[in-house]
């Protein structure tokens, strides 16, 4: 059934709005998946905070025009599902990677981030990207390590002095 022009405009506006706040995007070929498998993918996407939509390629091209995901325009060929990571840059890639393990028919086509287009070989790299909280925790640990070592060194001076005095006292 053909979509009316108003419906097409609404879809383009919705996808464009989602893309404006997305951190990364992934597209995959979903041919060969059953309805239950697609429903499962949608459920997993909702749980992981990923916007997932099957959208016509022409409408997707209109939606990505003027966004950082414009690099995807030439890669939109065939029936594709579009996933946008909202909270963590690797969320969509992680979702697709985990789903692809159990479903051979599901094939990741491209990934995009910060205006750059990446092939499916980068899926593992994207999936390993830390969440914001994980990145901040790692940064905090890196910043805290020298201070912790310095405090331990300062604490060791009186401890060594006490041990020396105890050894001298034991020897007399």
From Swiss-Prot:
Keywords: Ribonucleoprotein, Ribosomal protein, RNA-binding, rRNA-binding. GO terms for cellular component: ribonucleoprotein complex; ribosome. It comes from the Bacteria. Transmembrane segments: none annotated. GO terms for biological process: translation. InterPro entries: Ribosomal_uL10 (IPR001790), Ribosomal_uL10-like_sf (IPR043141), Ribosomal_uL10_bac (IPR022973), Ribosomal_uL10_bac_type (IPR047865). It holds the Pfam family Ribosomal_L10. One of its GO terms (molecular function) is large ribosomal subunit rRNA binding. Forms part of the ribosomal stalk, playing a central role in the interaction of the ribosome with GTP-bound translation factors. PANTHER family: 39S RIBOSOMAL PROTEIN L10, MITOCHONDRIAL. Part of the ribosomal stalk of the 50S ribosomal subunit. The N-terminus interacts with L11 and the large rRNA to form the base of the stalk. The C-terminus forms an elongated spine to which L12 dimers bind in a sequential fashion forming a multimeric L10(L12)X complex. This is Large ribosomal subunit protein uL10. It comes from Francisella tularensis subsp. mediasiatica (strain FSC147). The lineage of its organism: Bacteria, Pseudomonadati, Pseudomonadota, Gammaproteobacteria, Thiotrichales. The gene is rplJ.
